[in-house]
Amino acid sequence: MNIAKIVREAREQSRLTTLDFATGIFDEFIQLHGDRSFRDDGAVVGGIGWLGDQAVTVVGIQKGKSLQDNLKRNFGQPHPEGYRKALRLMKQAEKFGRPVVTFINTAGAYPGVGAEERGQGEAIARNLMEMSDLKVPIIAIIIGEGGSGGALALAVADRVWMLENSIYAILSPEGFASILWKDGTRAMEAAELMKITSHELLEMDVVDKVISEVGLSSKELIKSVKKELQTELARLSQKPLEELLEERYQRFRKY
């Protein structure tokens, strides 16, 4: 698949969402709401579910599948209260010894005036700091777009995976082309230079695993992700805490 098709597929409105994975993978998934400071952000969803006999905290960025739903979800662009909700749930997971799984699909954090006034940069930075030392296993999965710091704020993890037809980048190809050439129409040319596809990033050790989507139905893909999570969470849970945190630190330090 060429780069243009991959970008289109990553942005496809009908693509599986965080809630699709959360309800399909985890038994008895219960959503939790609010950041306990300002409000609940519909762009970030999270809660608790069971993976076998293991309670897991699930957090992710949610896009809509219709115009009305996208308005509710702010087109998958979180406000600072969304990142603070995510952090609240992750700290709760740490308190009760639950591993964390995050699902990421965003063009980036919302850049509006209100979001900036409420501390968008601080919220993202705090997530990076807190996740780097969170004392439970973390697995992050990019399921569509992984855009800039808005994606990274949920991706400081022990394992970072990508669905095969997803992308992960410092900014959009359109933004890159506009900055580099002052011409947003050269977006796909920019995408080639940026190395944003799953297999390119796996080759560069930015991500740890690519989950194949070829020939799989939605149910089969969810089942595949569930199997991978069960295996990897069992492995990570066996690691001594000091070793887990040191490996997480070194994983990001090497960049």
Curated annotation (Swiss-Prot):
It is found in: Cytoplasm. Acetyl-CoA carboxylase is a heterohexamer composed of biotin carboxyl carrier protein (AccB), biotin carboxylase (AccC) and two subunits each of ACCase subunit alpha (AccA) and ACCase subunit beta (AccD). Its main location: cytoplasm. Keywords: ATP-binding, Cytoplasm, Fatty acid biosynthesis, Fatty acid metabolism, Lipid biosynthesis, Lipid metabolism, Nucleotide-binding, Transferase. GO terms for cellular component: acetyl-CoA carboxylase complex. Pathway: Lipid metabolism; malonyl-CoA biosynthesis; malonyl-CoA from acetyl-CoA: step 1/1. It comes from the Bacteria. GO terms for molecular function: acetyl-CoA carboxylase activity; ATP binding; carboxyl- or carbamoyltransferase activity. It catalyses: N(6)-carboxybiotinyl-L-lysyl-[protein] + acetyl-CoA = N(6)-biotinyl-L-lysyl-[protein] + malonyl-CoA. One of its GO terms (biological process) is fatty acid biosynthetic process. Component of the acetyl coenzyme A carboxylase (ACC) complex. First, biotin carboxylase catalyzes the carboxylation of biotin on its carrier protein (BCCP) and then the CO(2) group is transferred by the carboxyltransferase to acetyl-CoA to form malonyl-CoA. Residues 1-235 form the CoA carboxyltransferase C-terminal domain. InterPro entries: Acetyl_CoA_COase_a_su, ClpP/crotonase-like_dom_sf, COA_CT_C. Pfam families: ACCA (PF03255). This is Acetyl-coenzyme A carboxylase carboxyl transferase subunit alpha. Transmembrane segments: none annotated. Disulfide bonds: none annotated. The keyword Coiled coil does not apply. Its EC number is 2.1.3.15. The lineage of its organism: Bacteria, Bacillati, Bacillota, Bacilli, Lactobacillales. Belongs to the AccA family.
